[in-house]
C-alpha cells in the first residue's frame, strides 16, 4: 500500500468547479450567493435577515434561501414564497431548484 501524500489526495479534494473543497468550506459566499442576496436586499428593503446558501456544491444549480421580513406580515406562506420567486424570476431560469424559508420578525 502506498503512503498518503497531499499530491495524491488533491483530486479527491476538488469540488464540482475544480476549486478545492477547503476553499468552499472557508469562503464567505459564492458569486451566485452574493448576486441572489443583493437582489433580495433590493426587493425586500425591510428584511431583517437574509441568508442565501448554494446547496449544489458551489455550482449555482440549487439554493436555499432564508428571509425574514415585515413584507411577509399577514400573508400566507405560499404568498410569501411567490414574492421571493417573483423577485428572483430571472435568476430562477438558470437554477435547478430553490428551497425557500420565509418568516416575519418576532416582536
From Swiss-Prot:
It is found in: Mitochondrion. Pfam families: BolA. Widely expressed. Keywords: Disease variant, Mitochondrion, Primary mitochondrial disease. SUPFAM superfamilies: BolA-like. GO terms for cellular component: cytosol; iron-sulfur cluster assembly complex; mitochondrial matrix; mitochondrion; nuclear body. Transmembrane segments: none annotated. GO terms for biological process: adaptive thermogenesis; cell redox homeostasis; energy homeostasis; glucose metabolic process; intracellular iron ion homeostasis; iron-sulfur cluster assembly; response to lipoic acid. InterPro entries: BolA, BolA-like_sf, Mt_Fe-S_assembly_factor. Disulfide bonds: none annotated. Acts as a mitochondrial iron-sulfur (Fe-S) cluster assembly factor that facilitates (Fe-S) cluster insertion into a subset of mitochondrial proteins. Probably acts together with NFU1. Interacts with NFU1. Belongs to the BolA/IbaG family. It is linked to Multiple mitochondrial dysfunctions syndrome 2 with hyperglycinemia: A severe disorder of systemic energy metabolism, resulting in weakness, respiratory failure, lack of neurologic development, lactic acidosis, hyperglycinemia and early death. Some patients show failure to thrive, pulmonary hypertension, hypotonia and irritability. Biochemical features include severe combined deficiency of the 2-oxoacid dehydrogenases, defective lipoic acid synthesis and reduction in activity of mitochondrial respiratory chain complexes. This is BolA-like protein 3. The gene is BOLA3.
Amino acid at each position: 500500500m502506498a503512503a498518503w501524500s497531499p499530491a495524491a489526495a488533491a483530486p479527491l479534494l476538488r469540488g464540482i468547479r475544480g476549486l478545492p473543497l477547503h476553499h468552499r468550506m472557508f469562503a464567505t459566499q459564492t458569486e451566485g450567493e452574493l448576486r441572489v442576496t443583493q437582489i433580495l436586499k433590493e426587493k425586500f428593503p425591510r428584511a431583517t435577515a437574509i441568508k442565501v446558501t448554494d446547496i449544489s456544491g458551489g455550482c449555482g444549480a440549487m439554493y436555499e434561501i432564508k428571509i425574514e421580513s415585515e413584507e411577509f406580515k399577514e400573508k400566507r406562506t405560499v404568498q410569501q414564497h411567490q414574492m421571493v420567486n417573483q423577485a428572483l424570476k430571472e435568476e430562477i431560469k438558470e437554477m435547478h431548484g430553490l428551497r425557500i424559508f420565509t418568516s416575519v420578525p418576532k416582536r
